[in-house]
């Protein structure tokens, strides 16, 4: 991932599309079908009501995204990556893209481990995005009559 349009940064066309759609509609959900984290500063500029990272969902990814967007399922979950405020916040940026040798200078401190150990202030910069990106569920649910069957739980 490099700080270039079409990699970490949106292309001019992608950003123009988001701007146009967000300004034309009261409610906008931006679906990011990407294979890596991208710059999220555009969220502050265009303020979509929802952002859904669908990552690489495979054969059923489209159905899963449709279920989330239509409210058939709850999108709560944990992010598999830390989405920092800037690409320079990631320690791997300094060593990315060498065609001859990959340098893993971060050791075990990749992703959330790095941010929780060495850069809590950098991850806090992204907290304002979490209500959009983290998948907070504002509803409620309860389980009744749960019982253990085999290796799964069954609820009614």
Regions found by a protein language model. Give the residues of each.
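C-terminal non-catalytic regions of proteins with extracellular/luminal or membrane-system context
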Residues: 1-156
């Amino acid at each position: 991932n490099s700080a270039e349009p079409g990699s970490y940064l949106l292309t001019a066309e992608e950003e123009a599309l988001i701007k146009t759609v967000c300004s034309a509609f009261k409610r906008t959900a931006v679906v990011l079908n990407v294979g890596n984290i991208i710059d999220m500063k555009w969220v502050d500029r265009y303020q979509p009501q929802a952002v859904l990272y669908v990552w690489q969902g495979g054969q059923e990814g489209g159905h899963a995204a449709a279920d989330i967007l239509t409210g058939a399922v709850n999108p709560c979950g944990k992010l598999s990556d830390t989405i920092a405020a800037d690409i320079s916040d990631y320690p791997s940026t300094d060593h990315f893209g060498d065609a001859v040798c990959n340098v893993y200078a971060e050791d075990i401190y990749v992703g959330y481990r790095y941010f929780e150990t060495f850069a809590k202030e950098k991850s806090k910069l992204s907290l304002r995005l979490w209500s959009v990106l983290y998948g907070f569920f504002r509803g409620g649910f309860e389980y009744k009559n749960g019982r253990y069957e085999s290796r799964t739980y069954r609820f009614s």
